[in-house]
UniProtKB/Swiss-Prot annotation:
It comes from Salmonella arizonae (strain ATCC BAA-731 / CDC346-86 / RSK2980). It is found in: Cytoplasm. One of its GO terms (biological process) is L-arginine biosynthetic process. Pathway: Amino-acid biosynthesis; L-arginine biosynthesis; N(2)-acetyl-L-ornithine from L-glutamate: step 1/4. Residues 296-436 form the N-acetyltransferase domain. This is Amino-acid acetyltransferase. GO terms for cellular component: cytoplasm. Homohexamer. Its EC number is 2.3.1.1. Belongs to the acetyltransferase family. ArgA subfamily. It comes from the Bacteria. SUPFAM superfamilies: Acyl-CoA N-acyltransferases (Nat), Carbamate kinase-like. One of its GO terms (molecular function) is L-glutamate N-acetyltransferase activity.
């Protein structure tokens, strides 16, 4: 048991090192909704934020206070007012907003300052800085309704924020900002976080919600969404009456941020311990990313990919699942291979060997990394190989397999006799392996 834990620790550390190097010196904007702050797991989140800071990541933390404000209003018997799902902040509400936000600022600052206590980095000082980094303006009047002290961002002093980040501080920004006339305004945390991420040219914007991320109809987490897909999900949730959940608010901001140059926005759970670290320091992550460009890339292999392909297929060759290929053979046939890469690691591959005269192709050397076999990489490769075969004028595709017969049958392949193989392939058939032959029409 102890040996297994040690192995897990070593493997986990090895896998995280490339991400530590990649993230160091980058700017992350972290959006903490009031729901996350009042959850029992918030102390762990704060500790993990402190750990990110110790690794040299430049952090801007934006906090919201929606449930705390609502509780404060209820305690003072002051009815909240909304117009088009936006809070109307009258003078009384503003005082209660400032009170709730001020208490949270003090609490978060204290927690971040102590976040490295009881860790090997105990004694390391974290400087948390707040200030008038954001300048607000009023939302104004809409359909005859005055939003009073509800506002929006007018300007961000990114130079001042960058100076604090350069000095090693964590910048903490709350939902109350002042205008050029000295008035205070109540802003949404998602607007502040989004505008900050864009202005600071942040590498990432990170948000928290009650679930593990965005889920599909089966309840499985969707690991990656493009902005148009995220926008469609927002519209779907709004149609169901969900306008202000953590998921909807973050997705709205993430769509704008990605379209304005922020490379990746991450949505993770505040309820489970360690999600922030799992999302940032593991290849597969744990939540949902909103990205302009996929972390995965499917493309034709080049000579530089041979090492990654060999590393992927060797275990399968040793188990007898794949026919052994030497490096020399792979070098000669590399133009026949298609690979899927994730963060520069080859996680899947397949090859297409055309028999032009017979108008048929062989899909061979199909391999998917064990960590990714529960997803759709196999189907993606099959679709790409089939498309390549059609472009070559081939009308059929065949496979030889000893283990994946049902998988191919489920995808339109039919078992056939060896005699239906192309003549040259028939001569090379290995009767000791007794591979099954399956063929599909490309249509």
């Amino acid at each position: 048991m102890i040996k297994e834990r040690r192995t897990e620790l070593v493997e986990g550390f090895r896998h995280s090192v490339p991400y530590i190097n990649t993230h160091r010196g980058k700017t992350f904007v972290i959006m903490l909704g009031g729901e996350a702050i009042e959850h029992d797991n918030f102390s762990s989140i704060v500790n993990d934020i402190g750990l990110l800071h110790s690794l040299g990541i430049r952090l801007v933390v934006v906090y919201g206070a929606r449930p705390q404000i609502d509780a404060n209003l209820a305690a003072h018997h002051h009815e909240p007012i909304y117009h088009k799902n936006t809070r109307v902040t009258d003078a009384k509400t503003l005082e209660l907003v400032k009170q709730a936000a001020g208490l949270l600022q003090l609490d978060i600052t204290a927690r971040l300052s102590m976040s490295l206590n009881n860790t090997p980095l105990q004694g390391a000082h974290i400087n948390v800085v707040s200030g008038n980094f954001t300048i607000a303006q009023p939302l104004g009047v809409d359909d005859g309704v005055d939003y009073c002290h509800s506002g929006r961002i007018r300007r961000i002093d990114e130079d001042a924020i960058n100076r604090q980040l350069d000095n090693g501080a964590i910048v903490l920004i709350g939902p109350v900002a002042v205008s050029v006339t000295g008035e205070s305004f109540n802003l949404t945390s998602e607007e502040i976080a989004t505008q900050l991420a864009v202005k600071l040219k942040a590498e990432k914007m990170i948000g928290f919600c009650s679930s593990q991320g965005v889920t599909n109809s089966k309840g499985d987490v969707i690991s990656e969404l493009f902005p148009n897909e995220a926008q469609a999900r927002v519209e779907e949730l709004e149609a169901q009456g969900d306008y202000n959940s953590g998921t909807v608010r973050f997705l709205r901001g993430a769509v704008k941020a990605c379209r304005s140059g922020v490379r990746r926005c991450h949505l993770i759970s505040y309820q489970e311990d360690g999600t922030l670290l799992q999302e940032l320091f593991s290849r597969e992550g744990i939540g949902t990313q909103i990205v302009m460009e996929s972390a995965e890339q499917i493309r034709r292999a080049t000579i530089n990919d041979i090492g990654g392909i060999l590393e992927l297929i060797r275990p399968l060759e040793q188990q007898g699942i794949l026919v052994r290929r030497s490096r020399e053979q792979l070098e000669m046939e590399i133009d026949k291979f298609t690979i899927i890469q994730r963060d520069n690691m080859t996680i899947a591959c397949a090859a297409l060997y055309p028999f032009v005269e017979e108008k048929i192709g062989e899909m061979a050397c199909v391999a998917v990394h064990p960590d990714y076999r529960s997803s759709s990489r196999g189907e993606i490769l099959l679709e790409r190989i089939a498309a390549q075969a059609r472009q070559m004028g081939l009308s059929k595709l065949f496979v030889l397999t000893t283990r994946s017969i049902h998988w191919f049958q489920e995808r339109g392949f039919t078992p056939v006799d060896i005699e239906l193989l192309p003549e040259s392939k028939k001569k090379m058939y290995n009767y000791q392996r007794r591979s099954k032959v399956l063929i599909a029409d490309l249509g």
